[in-house]
Curated annotation (Swiss-Prot):
Bias-annotated ranges (Basic residues): 328-343
Gene, per the UniProt record: CHRM1
Superkingdom of this protein's organism: Eukaryota
Bias-annotated ranges (Low complexity): 238-247
Cellular-component GO terms for this entry: GABA-ergic synapse; glutamatergic synapse; plasma membrane; postsynaptic membrane
Gene Ontology terms, MF aspect: G protein-coupled acetylcholine receptor activity; G protein-coupled receptor activity
Name of the protein this chain belongs to: Muscarinic acetylcholine receptor M1
Function: The muscarinic acetylcholine receptor mediates various cellular responses, including inhibition of adenylate cyclase, breakdown of phosphoinositides and modulation of potassium channels through the action of G proteins. Primary transducing effect is Pi turnover.
Subcellular compartments: Cell membrane; Postsynaptic cell membrane
Organism: Macaca mulatta (Rhesus macaque)
């Protein structure tokens, strides 16, 4: 929404001339009604999607959820009451309803701006301070920041709108009109426009520019890293030495030809796995290493002992068993494999950086769409606010009405931005609209399963 309503700048304006024809009234009513319906439907889809699809329950999407709540309030109350105001040509619902509408409208509008600032700062710190910031980036902290954004918006607008007339001792709002009393002076309206629109937009654009520059720098670093890799070396090779660990002291090794009578099931060893999580914008590598700290690229293969059934009975003699053969890198093996490990480490680092870059670009794309929609829909009205400060009669009444409504349209566009830039939102919207949401298991499945190596058992 906007920072000030048209009557706040020109209190003596008749909102809609009573002489409007029935076709004009019908056109305005149908158009605004459809916009209100689209706004409510779109933002309800966002809320329901967040509820049913656990893949969307991420820290970044908590801010989008808060923004959708503000847009839902605007679509449900602000749009419809303003349409009534336009069609009737005067405010007929009383002074209390007027003040409550204005308070709700301005609190929700300011909360939208605050949420956009939170999204911008969240993306900025995630890109520029990935280690320190993401350690503190939890759902609880996100909820706290969202709560503060709404609290600040409420404190700034609601008390002043509701109680200003009691502070000054009289109500100066003209009969049949609805606007904020303390914004009747153009200079005050100009100040609120600067603080509530131009300053936040400047901060958002600056942060987005910094995010763009940082993302481009990372893309160049990734290209340089990938270009320095040597193909065909160190893809999965590891040099290791085998050490025999007897099952008991003094027991000889099992002859090569001996067959086990009891075979263990195959063991699964995970060398590394990708974690893809919308909440974290980077993939993380996990390595299975020995207790002595092998490098992530090394592979540990444990062969379980094959114990004879007869040897399991209690006896004074130590049981005979096949040796525990542990295949693990040694210092000597590492020295020989040093050249092969480096390319593998670079390959894993390149994969991690690629995944991080993809996530950052996707989040930046969503942010850019939201910011672009916000700037395009809010700028015309706020330009008219500046013009009216120096020339009261230079802005036609029709432009005021269009500019005011265009601010509302931003709440209609935001859910479309989520769907266009986020495949998870888009797929969930489609399933909900087709009434097929119950046919899908809303459970997050890792998109990059870990690479699992199977150690085969001995064949009898």
């Amino acid at each position: 929404m906007n920072t000030s309503a048209p009557p706040a700048v020109s209190p003596n304006i008749t909102v809609l001339a009573p002489g409007k024809g029935p076709w004009q009234v019908a056109f305005i009513g149908i158009t605004t009604g459809l916009l209100s319906l689209a706004t409510v439907t779109g933002n309800l889809l966002v809320l329901i999607s967040f509820k049913v699809n656990t893949e969307l329950k991420t820290v970044n999407n908590y801010f989008l959820l808060s923004l959708a709540c503000a847009d839902l309030i605007i679509g449900t109350f602000s749009m419809n009451l303003y349409t009534t105001y336009l069609l009737m040509g005067h405010w007929a619902l009383g002074t209390l309803a007027c003040d409550l509408w204005l308070a709700l409208d301005y609190v929700a509008s300011n909360a939208s701006v605050m949420n956009l600032l939170l999204i911008s700062f969240d993306r900025y710190f995630s890109v520029t301070r990935p280690l320190s910031y993401r350690a503190k980036r939890t759902p609880r902290r996100a909820a706290l920041m969202i709560g503060l954004a709404w609290l600040v918006s409420f404190v700034l607008w609601a008390p002043a709108i509701l109680f200003w007339q009691y502070l000054v001792g009289e109500r100066t709002v003209l009969a049949g009109q609805c606007y904020i009393q303390f914004l009747s002076q153009p200079i005050i309206t100009f100040g609120t426009a600067m603080a509530a629109f131009y300053l936040p937009v400047t901060v958002m654009c600056t942060l987005y520019w910094r995010i763009y520059r940082e993302t481009e720098n990372r893309a160049r670093e990734l290209a340089a890293l990938q270009g320095s890799e040597t193909p065909g070396k160190g893809g999965g090779s590891s040099s290791s030495s085998e050490r025999s660990q007897p099952g008991a002291e003094g027991s000889p090794e099992t002859p090569p030809g001996r067959c086990c009578r009891c075979c263990r099931p195959p063991r699964l060893l995970q060398a590394y796995s990708w974690k893809e999580d919308e909440e974290e914008d980077e993939g993380s590598m996990e390595s299975l290493t020995s207790s002595e700290g092998e490098e992530p690229g090394s592979e540990v293969v444990i062969k379980m002992p094959m114990v004879d059934p007869e040897a399991q009975a209690p006896t004074k003699q130590p049981p005979r068993s096949s040796p525990n053969t542990v295949k693990r890198p040694t210092k000597k093996g590492r020295d020989r494999a040093g050249k092969g490990q480096k390319p593998r480490g670079k390959e894993q680092l390149a994969k991690r950086k690629t995944f991080s870059l993809v996530k950052e670009k996707k989040a930046a794309r969503t942010l850019s769409a939201i910011l672009l929609a916000f700037i395009l829909t809010w700028t015309p009205y706020n330009i008219m606010v500046l013009v009216s400060t120096f020339c009261k009669d230079c802005v036609p009444e029709t432009l005021w009405e269009l500019g005011y409504w265009l601010c509302y349209v931003n709440s209609t566009i935001n859910p479309m931005c989520y769907a266009l830039c986020n495949k998870a939102f888009r797929d969930t919207f489609r399933l909900l609209l087709l009434c097929r949401w119950d046919k899908r298991r809303w459970r997050k499945i890792p998109k990059r399963p870990g690479s699992v190596h199977r150690t085969p058992s001995r064949q009898c």
